[in-house]
Design a protein with these regions (language model features):
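ABC ATP-binding cassette signature C-motif
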Residues: 2-183
């Protein structure tokens, strides 16, 4: 088992005077954990993640956090710059200074053929954005300690789901996956 990143003890939260969860929550997140947070709309999945990251304060209980880096990937993939083209986006993440042909090879692996390289990112579908983001993170080779993925497979076809699933499986850090799905 890995280093303890977050310990939440008897936490609860309320936007009003009532608490969000019927019973207080106890959670421990360790380095390398794969945690799948499921629930219906309004059940508090995103609120829980915001509490764990320190973006919200609990109404009850305590949360202790180690020092770690994280990347929250929302459904809009707002980490991407919508004004750049697909290829320009990969160049932006190219901290390893890969050659142009290597970038193009990686783009192809993530289902971005030549004819998509000049496409502006604001024109991409939700599935294309998440694929491009994972492609860029592979190119950047500077993954955070924790990935938080909010509904990463929404609007994806089966081939895209397989690519994203493989990328998540190959990632060695901690993954917090928020979804309605029980997969």
């Amino acid at each position: 088992t890995g280093k303890i990143l977050i310990t939440a003890d008897q936490i609860n939260f309320g936007y009003t005077s009532s608490c969000l969860w019927k019973s207080p929550l106890n959670i421990q997140v360790r380095s390398g954990d794969r945690i799948h947070i499921t629930g219906n709309n309004g059940s508090g999945k995103t609120t829980l993640v915001k509490l764990l990251l320190g973006e919200l304060k609990p109404a009850a209980g305590t949360i202790t956090r180690a020092d770690f880096s994280y990347l929250y990937i929302d459904q809009e993939c707002s980490v991407l710059d919508p004004g750049l083209t697909v290829f320009e986006q990969t160049e932006r993440f190219n901290a390893s200074h890969l050659a142009e042909h290597e970038l193009k090879s990686i783009l192809n692996r993530y289902l971005f053929p030549y004819e998509t390289w000049d496409k502006p990112c604001f024109c991409l579908s939700g599935g294309e954005k998440i694929r491009l983001l994972f492609c860029c993170l592979m190119i950047g080779n500077n993954a955070p300690d924790v990935f938080i993925l909010d509904e990463p497979t929404n609007n994806l076809d089966i081939q895209s789901v397989e690519i994203i699933t493989a990328a998540i499986k190959s990632y060695r850090g901690t993954v917090l996956l928020i979804s309605h799905d029980h997969y």
